[in-house]
UniProtKB/Swiss-Prot annotation:
Pathway: Pyrimidine metabolism; CTP biosynthesis via de novo pathway; UDP from UMP (UMPK route): step 1/1. Its EC number is 2.7.4.22. Keywords: Allosteric enzyme, ATP-binding, Cytoplasm, Kinase, Nucleotide-binding, Pyrimidine biosynthesis, Transferase. It comes from the Bacteria. Catalyzes the reversible phosphorylation of UMP to UDP. ATP binds at K12, L13, S14, G15, G55, R59, T162, Y168, D171. GO terms for molecular function: ATP binding; UMP kinase activity. This is Uridylate kinase. GO terms for cellular component: cytosol. SUPFAM superfamilies: Carbamate kinase-like.
Amino acid sequence: MSNPIYKRILLKLSGEALQGAEGFGIDPSILDRMALEIKELIAMGVEVGVVLGGGNLFRGAKLAKAGMNRVVGDHMGMLATVMNGLAMRDALHRADVNAKLMSAFQLNGICDTYNWSEAIKMLREKRVVIFSGGTGSPFFTTDSAACLRGIEIEADVVLKATKVDGVYNCDPAKNPGAELFNTLTYADVIERELKVMDLAAFTLARDHGMPIRVFNMGKPGALREVVTGLTEGTIIS
């Protein structure tokens, strides 16, 4: 087994990545596969933090456009990430991986409230820490939460799992000839207006020198390849 190039990672999983072909909810087979891939990393000695989106269950911004108060919609979206976190924690436990679910806001009896020093302690003990509830504030995406938690826990990289193989010069779904980038600078992304993540999240990562790696979690084994330094996905630094 190859040696990992990262000691501690923050893995950002979108809610859509959990829904499979169903188009809504959680596909148990995908959840179990992700848990096993994370287990591989723990066996390699990598410390893993996870941030989950909630778009498979609820999208606050979409309902805000339909007239719902944006703050209410975002609060509902935050709760959706907790539901995904509970499912991921359960899948990890079934795979015999120690995992702790933390929320950005209090949910007594369901999960722990986010505590920075406790999270660091658990990561050092090789327990997977799942950060749910976004940043705890409305108007911030779960990409912002991923970059924030990644910076806080001093991760070596934020790994953004998507449905495509990395960052392209245009939408590969619309243009089969789209060019995949292996490496980019933060300036490249802004100048070319490439869609990596929302600007607030991206500039947070840039300002703190946090590398971002975008890859396709749908490819079995891709997570291991990313962590062992193989040319998988796009690295932005």
